Structures are given as structure tokens and as C-alpha cells.
Amino acid sequence: MKCVFIYNPNSGKGKIKKKKDYIYSRLKEKFDEVEMIATEYPKHALELAEKVCEECDYLIFSGGDGTFNEIIQGIASQEKRPVIGYIPTGTVNDNARNLGMSKNIKKSMDIILQDKQLNMDICKLGDQYFSYVAALGSFSAMSYATKQKNKKLLGVLAYALNGMDDLFHGKNFDVKVTLTDGTVYEKNCAFMGILNSKSVGGFRFNKEADIADGLIDFVMVESKMKNEKPRSFVSGLRIFKMFLRGIKAKRDLKHVIHFVSDGATIELKDNVVWCIDGEKGDTGSKKIEMLHHHVKVIVKE
């Protein structure tokens, strides 16, 4: 069997680059052939993943949630898709929480070599694939708007500081969501998230999520309640409370609407920017599809 290992040499303060010989030796315990490839520029992991699909049985990679998305983007449209394994070295690592992977390289390598596989769902928004979240509105731009040097220096705190502006100046948007069964939700929102994840932004606010059940979680935070003027600060606090309490705490979160579906059409009046797996995406109205059990991924036993 052949394994390709793709790694971002700059992720995790260069930790993977220092440990690549160790990773190679561990992979050789299982695979007859191991090829190590370092990414050299943005979206390179996507290009590499797409290229190696036909030639490898396993695709192991390291990086943050952005790298995870690039790998998914690269393999999801291919007819032959290798089993993927992940060593998290990013700042937040939401995908790692879903899979039970560790930032400790030895522990992650142990899990990868145990080779317990899960048929993971993948979502498609327009022509973009994503593994765990697509979002609109306040705080959704934090991950891609935060400078890389600040992430390295401050970690998760860098995201929090970058999001303070949204707390006071977040913009609301009108959205109409039509589910595959015909149900319609039409609201003025401060935030909307489309989730296939237990964790987003480091917050485990969707603990009951199953990344292989064929269903997508939708959560909308209304920006205006009855007899209330829309205020970005109030809306921001509502979003923050939702992340802290979880989307199931409906008694305390009357402004939060949560529902599930296997797909939807999302209509936006304005060209609001999408955040896809923590990266800047397209703008405007989109169709979302669920690709059930689309990718085999290694998970913790």
C-alpha cells in the first residue's frame, strides 16, 4: 500500500517539519511506500490532494482546519478517494475534536496506525465542499480575518480580539432557507451556521452532532425580537451566549432557531460573504447538499 503525507511546514510553529523523520518512520511501519510532500503556497494542499488521489491508498496530512478543508476540496470531487488521516497542528482544530485526534504527534500517529475508519459526511455549498461549517454574519470572518502572526503569538485569543469589532458593529442580513421537505425559515439574522460538527471556533456548542448521520444542523440567531430595535451589541451577546450554552439550550435561547435537514436552498438579499471551514468563501445565495458517507477518515477508537 502507498501513503502520501502532505504537511504545511509553517503550521504549528514548524513542529511537523522538525518531526517529519519520526512521522516517516512510523508510517513505514504500516505502508510499503511513503511519500512526503511539503506545501509551498496557499491552496497547494488542495492541488496536491487532487493530484495524488489516483496513486495512493492513504492520504495523511497535517495543518489546521484550513488545510483540512483544502484536502477535502481536493478529493471530494474525485471518483477514487483515499482514506484520510489527520495530524492537527493549527490554532483551533475543530476537525480534530470531531475525530478524536490529538495535537500530540505520537498520539495522533498511534491512532492513524490503529486505522479505525469512519465514513464521514461532507457538505457542498454551491460548488465548494466543506467538512464542518459554513457560516454567515457576525464573528464568521474571525478565522480568516485574523493575521497569521497574531495566531502564532496569541493563539485562540487572537480570534477573540479580532471579533470585538463585530460585537459592536456587526451587520444583520435577511435570509430565506427552504429545506428539501419544503419547510421555509425566513428571518433577519445576526448569524447563521450550517454545521456538520460538534465544535466550531473551539466551542463545543453542538455536542450531540454526528458527522456520519446524513443530516446537517442549521442554526439561526435572530437579530430582532418582537418590539425590539435591532442592535449589534445585543445580537453579538446572543451569539456568544449560544456558543457558551450550546444550541440545545432552547429555554434560555429563545432567539436561536435550530433545525436539521439533508439539504436546503439559501436565498440572500445581499451579497453576504460566506465563511467555509474557517476560510473566506463566495457571496450570495447558495444551494447546500449533503454527501452522505462520502470520505473515509481515520478516527480515535
What are these regions (language model features)?
Residues 1-62, 107, 182:
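ATP/NTP phosphate-donor binding region
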Residues 179-181, 210, 220-301:
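ATP/nucleoside-binding phosphotransfer catalytic cores, i.e., glycine-rich phosphate-binding loops
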Residues 135, 139, 193-206, 280:
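Glycine-rich phosphate/pyrophosphate-binding beta-alpha loops
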Residues 67-79:
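Short Gly/Thr/Asp-enriched flexible loops that form oxyanion-binding sites at enzyme active sites
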Residues 31, 56, 188-189, 260-262, ...:
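Short, well-ordered alpha-helix to beta-strand connector turns
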Residues 30, 39, 77-194:
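Catalytic core of DAGKc-family lipid kinases
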Residues 171-173, 188-190, 212-217, 262-264:
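A generic structural signal for short beta-strands and their flanking turns/coil linkers
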Residues 150-158, 202, 208-231:
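Gly/Ser/Thr-rich active-site loops/lids in small-molecule metabolic enzymes
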